[in-house]
Every structure is written in C-alpha cells, then in structure tokens.
Swiss-Prot record:
The keyword Oxidoreductase applies. Keywords: Flavoprotein, FMN, NAD, Oxidoreductase. This is 2-hydroxy-1,4-benzoquinone reductase. It is an enzyme of class 1 (oxidoreductase). It catalyses: 2-hydroxy-1,4-benzoquinone + NADH + 2 H(+) = benzene-1,2,4-triol + NAD(+). FMN binds at residues 11-18, 77-80, 113. Involved in the metabolism of 4-aminophenol. Catalyzes the reduction of the auto-oxidation product 2-hydroxy-1,4-benzoquinone back to hydroxyquinol. Has a broad substrate specificity toward benzoquinones, converting them to the corresponding 1,4-benzenediols. Belongs to the SsuE family. InterPro entries: Flavoprotein-like_sf, FMN_Rdtase-like_dom, NAD(P)H-dep_reductase. It comes from the Bacteria. Its cofactor is FMN. Binds 1 FMN per subunit.
C-alpha cells in the first residue's frame, strides 16, 4: 500500500530553493511513497471569524493534510523564523478549535537558505509550533542546509554525490519514521 506524504513548502517563490529541495528529497524516496505538494499560497490570512464559515480553499487544504500518512515540511528562514505563509497554513489546519488534522501525524522538518546556518532558527521555532499541534516529528537527523547550486540545481536535481548521500540518509530515516508511526 502506497504511503501518501503531504509536502508543505513554506515558500511561495516560483523558483524556491525549498521547492527544489523538496523535489530532490521526493526523488530519493522509496517506491511505495507518493508526494502531494500542498499549495498554501491561496489560503487567506487566518481569522477566528472564519471558524463558523470555513472557506472552501481551507477545507480542501485540511482534507489534503487529513488524507496524508505523513508530513514533510520544507521551510526557508525569513528574519530568523518561519515564513508567515507557513504559520498561516499551520493555523488553518488546526482550526476550528478541537478540529485539528495535525494531531498524531508523523512528520519531519528540513530546509535550505543562503544564510550560513541554513534554516536552523526557523526550524527551531517551527518545532515548537509542531509540538503544540501534536505533530510527531522526527528529531534526528536535523539538517540545516546552506543553499548552493552545486548541490541541487534549479530543477530539483541533485548534482553532488555527497549531497545525494546526505539527503538519502534523511529520506531513509524519514521513510522508516513514517512507516513506524503512521496513524
């Protein structure tokens, strides 16, 4: 039986390095894994006023998360934190109160940035939010990747053999994590 992974990329940029990373990771996954790249760009800014009349785009987003066996969150780092669009998506799928679809889902966080420490601080902030939402995160390996086109090209192809080995380690552990914990 195929395992469906919801991929949430915290960047809306057309040529996002994190989208490239997400596609590179998907190429390393076991054959029984399928990846659903979830669009978060169409979600309006969350307000509790929506709880009584949930927009269709938010219902569809929540359903994509609910239907997934696992989560892969790929985030850039903006001003030493996660992007607002990613936090907004996390909020939408946790609402209305008591109707979160995140709880118990096995997940992992990874990201890339041009900064020297990659996405270390964004991932730290994101881990706190995910813990509150009861997403069961893989703790190791943590990967904070400094973006470099000699590693992954603009099409999401892994260029460097060292990068392939590095990311394969992540994917192998992630695949085992999801298999062992899927709800």
């Amino acid at each position: 039986m195929a395992l469906k992974i919801a991929v949430v990329v915290g960047s809306l940029r057309r040529d996002s390095f994190n989208k490239q990373l997400a596609h590179a990771l998907a190429s390393l996954a076991p054959s029984d894994f399928s990846f659903d790249f979830v669009d978060i760009g169409g979600l309006p800014l969350y307000s509790q006023d929506y709880d009584s009349d949930f927009p269709e785009v938010a219902r569809a987003f929540k359903q994509q998360i609910a239907d997934a066996d696992g989560l892969l969150i790929v985030t850039p780092e903006y001003n030493r934190s996660m992007p607002g669009v990613l936090k907004n998506a996390l909020d939408w799928a946790s609402r209305p109160w008591g109707q979160s679809v995140w709880g118990g889902k096995p997940g992992a966080i990874i990201g890339t940035s041009v900064g020297a420490i990659g996405t270390a601080i964004a991932q730290s902030h994101l881990r706190g939010v995910c813990a509150y939402l009861d997403i069961v995160l893989m703790n190791q390996p943590e990967m904070y990747i400094k973006h470099d086109e000699s590693r992954i090209d603009a099409n999401g192809n892994i260029v460097s053999e060292d990068t392939r080995k590095y990311l394969q380690t992540f994917m192998d552990k992630y695949a085992a994590w999801v298999r062992d914990r899927r709800v």
